[in-house]
């Protein structure tokens, strides 16, 4: 049975273009289109599509407001289309706040080297997020995120809302929650890699990390160049630790998280306790910029067994080879479990390779980190 898709955009050209791409895949079928957010909400309720593709800027009701309404009334996996501008980045992050699962640039040439590759990517994204329909739930205000915002200085920090919805249902609670025990290993660096679903996952984890976290955190999120600065600023507004977009020459400091800039590669250089970040173009050899494999591989060379690493939700297998290098050096590797992933691709690749020592639900990863580093 084909995956039913509702296409929402005020541009007739874009509706037609997206519909043609979707309908060219036998797994997918466009069941209707909507020209604004209000119409999208109505059709989502009546047609119950498996996936919605949603523009952000539309008359009558914008895409962000529409996503909020849809998540309240009939939670549906939603893929946003966004412009690659600073304002577009902020709006896209707001849409993820509201419950959208993923996003793609409206200019397909910005996401692939040729048309066929772009078409395939869009089709794959729709097919992947459709699998999460049965796990969708309504957004719930996160008291943790609220208190975190209040704990930071005012001004613009309070203007940025928390990612209030986890788009997938957490694993069913056991009668008695598992109690974690530290392994006793000593760490000097935490490394996290993620892709699809990563913005929500990273915020969930990082907002629970205290300011006295004992070592630096490096973050690799597959994201366009214009998005990473806005995402780092948003995280910094919400977290007790400092979060910044990484710059060439940054000295790694405890209690600070460094987000790899989009369109570039981030590498760790130096020696433990005196390491810096190198930001490079990296050429076209790698499929991803930033690439988890590149960053994790460099961390393995510098920090060896002193790395606590995690692979979170994401499509593909980026991170597997970097984790292989980390594992060879004695580092610790965890993965996000299948049920809490938006896309169980990157964690699955690590799990199947036998590289992960623990598979954890998203809502307990921060707790596990704090236990492991002796803060809980």
UniProtKB/Swiss-Prot annotation:
Stretches with biased composition (Low complexity): 145-161
This protein's record includes keyword Phosphoprotein: yes
Domain of life per record: Bacteria
Catalytically driven reaction(s): [protein]-L-glutamate 5-O-methyl ester + H2O = L-glutamyl-[protein] + methanol + H(+); L-glutaminyl-[protein] + H2O = L-glutamyl-[protein] + NH4(+)
Active site: 195, 222, 318
A GO term, aspect molecular function: protein-glutamate methylesterase activity
PTM note: Phosphorylated by CheA. Phosphorylation of the N-terminal regulatory domain activates the methylesterase activity.
EC number: 3.1.1.61, 3.5.1.44
Domain Response regulatory: 4-121
CheB-type methylesterase domain mapped to chain residues: 183-376
Locations listed in the record: Cytoplasm
Modified residues (4-aspartylphosphate): 55
InterPro entries named in the record: CheB-like, CheB_C, CheY-like_superfamily, Sig_transdc_resp-reg_Me-estase, Sig_transdc_resp-reg_receiver
One Gene Ontology CC term in the entry: cytoplasm
Keywords, in A-Z order: Chemotaxis, Cytoplasm, Hydrolase, Phosphoprotein
NCBIfam families found in the cross-reference section: PRK00742.1
Family as reported in the entry's similarity comment: Belongs to the CheB family.
UniProt domain comment: Contains a C-terminal catalytic domain, and an N-terminal region which modulates catalytic activity.
Protein name: Protein-glutamate methylesterase/protein-glutamine glutaminase
Organism: Aliivibrio fischeri (strain ATCC 700601 / ES114) (Vibrio fischeri)
Gene of this entry: cheB
């Amino acid at each position: 049975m084909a995956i039913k898709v509702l296409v929402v955009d005020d541009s007739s050209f874009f509706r037609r273009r997206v519909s043609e791409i979707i309908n060219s895949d036998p797994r997918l079928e466009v069941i209707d289109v909507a020209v604004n957010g209000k119409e999208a909400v109505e059709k989502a309720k009546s047609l119950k599509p498996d996936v919605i593709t949603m523009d952000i800027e539309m008359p009558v009701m914008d895409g962000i407001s529409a996503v909020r309404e849809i998540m309240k009334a009939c939670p549906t996996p939603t893929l946003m289309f966004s412009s690659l501008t600073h304002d577009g980045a902020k709006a896209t992050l707001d849409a993820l706040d509201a419950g959208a699962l993923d996003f793609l640039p409206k200019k397909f040439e910005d996401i692939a080297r040729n048309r066929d590759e772009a078409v395939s990517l869009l089709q794959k994204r729709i097919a992947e997020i459709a699998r999460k329909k049965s796990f969708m739930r309504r957004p719930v205000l996160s008291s943790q995120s609220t208190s975190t915002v209040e704990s930071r200085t005012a001004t613009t920090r309070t203007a940025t809302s928390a990612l209030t919805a986890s788009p997938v249902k957490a694993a069913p609670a056991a009668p008695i929650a598992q109690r974690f025990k530290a392994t006793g290993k000593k760490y000097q660096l935490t490394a996290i890699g993620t892709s699809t679903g990563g913005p929500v996952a990273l915020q969930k984890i990082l907002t629970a990390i205290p300011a006295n976290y004992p070592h630096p955190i490096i973050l690799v999120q597959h994201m366009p160049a214009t998005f990473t600065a806005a995402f780092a600023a948003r995280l910094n507004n919400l977290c007790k630790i400092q979060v910044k977009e990484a710059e060439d020459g940054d000295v790694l400091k405890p209690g600070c998280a460094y987000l790899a800039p989009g369109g570039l590669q981030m590498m760790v250089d130096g020696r433990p306790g005196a390491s810096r970040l190198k930001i490079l173009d990296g050429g076209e050899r790698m499929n991803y910029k930033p690439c988890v494999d590149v960053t994790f591989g460099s961390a393995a060379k510098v920090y060896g067994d002193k790395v606590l690493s995690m692979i979170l939700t994401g499509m593909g297998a980026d991170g597997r080879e970097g984790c292989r290098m980390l594992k060879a050096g004695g580092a610790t590797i965890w993965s996000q479990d299948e049920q809490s992933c938006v896309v169980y691709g990157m964690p699955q690749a690590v799990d199947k390779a036998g590289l992960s020592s623990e598979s954890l639900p998203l809502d307990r990863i921060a707790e596990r980190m704090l236990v492991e580093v002796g803060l809980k």
